Swiss-Prot record:
Binding site for NADPH: W16, R36, K109, A141, R256, V280, E282
The entry's keywords: Cytoplasm, Lipid biosynthesis, Lipid metabolism, NAD, NADP, Nucleotide-binding, Oxidoreductase, Phospholipid biosynthesis, Phospholipid metabolism
Domain of life: Bacteria
HAMAP family: NAD_Glyc3P_dehydrog
Primary role: Catalyzes the reduction of the glycolytic intermediate dihydroxyacetone phosphate (DHAP) to sn-glycerol 3-phosphate (G3P), the key precursor for phospholipid synthesis.
Protein name per Swiss-Prot or TrEMBL: Glycerol-3-phosphate dehydrogenase [NAD(P)+]
A GO molecular-function descriptor: glycerol-3-phosphate dehydrogenase [NAD(P)+] activity
Transmembrane regions listed in the UniProt entry: none
Amino acid sequence: MTLAYRKIAVVGAGAWGTALAQVAASAGREVVLWAREDELVQNVNTAHENSLFLPGIALHKSIRATGDLAEAAEADALLMVTPAQHMRGVLEQLAPRIAEGKPVVLCAKGVEQSTHLLLTEVLAEAAPQAAAAVLSGPSFAAEVARGLPTAVTLACEDETVAEALTHAIGITTFRPYYSSDLIGAELGGAVKNVLAIACGIVEGKKFGDSARAALTTRGFAELTRLGLAMGARTETLMGLSGLGDLILTCNSPKSRNMSLGMALGEGKTLEEVMGARNSVSEGVHSATAVVALARKHGIEMPIAEAVARIVTGAAKVDDAVAALLSRPFRSET
């Protein structure tokens, strides 16, 4: 293993994992893409396409898919793109084969629902010998895979590793900015998914652009309060993985979390929306965990709490909205 990170394994062949494999291949790396589905492995290796999760985009012929986690573990660095709620199980399978100090880059955005742990904390329990890193920022998989310009944050406590990873996967159209603030980079992505559901509800209810702007801004205040309480840096929360990701996710129906919120605002049930999808909306699973973190740190997050009540069935959309709008007037800061 060297800091050149010549061989990259992408663990998880959904849309985002496939897009990151495309980026790493474009950067000249040897890329192994792990998928659960045998038919998807065959699809990538023979047709050079991910017809299931990223159809219509031609993949680099150098990307090699595998269903063998042990093979993926042999890479110089691992990009973990499995859904947040399944991350622990995959990491535990990989752990015996992860060498001391090998970078494991967490690319999913969420908080473990059952434990309320950040994914870096999950990694510390499952594979403590790994060098934890986080990749997060305003990015849609299809745009990244097509080579449209995108910038993200890549954080690792060892900034030398973060910089080396940036050079390993960075290309002209995919620009990672490195940082040593793991908590800030990770928390922004997890919380914005919850807030995006709220913004989608605003859109679905046709409350207007002013209401969505207000909710996005007040939501960012919630994210910032929690982030600072947990040790994140202000500049990280104001950066790509925080404010940047929030702006994108709360303003585009292409966001899975915002589109889910829109459907809820239009009157659909959560079961109806989730049943019609083959992709994951992490905000649904992270909402209760984010609220638990806020309570643990004594932070008020009324928007996140409203989303948590909606997705758990504790409140109807209209009742949760009414409760937010009837909160007492207060100072902005």
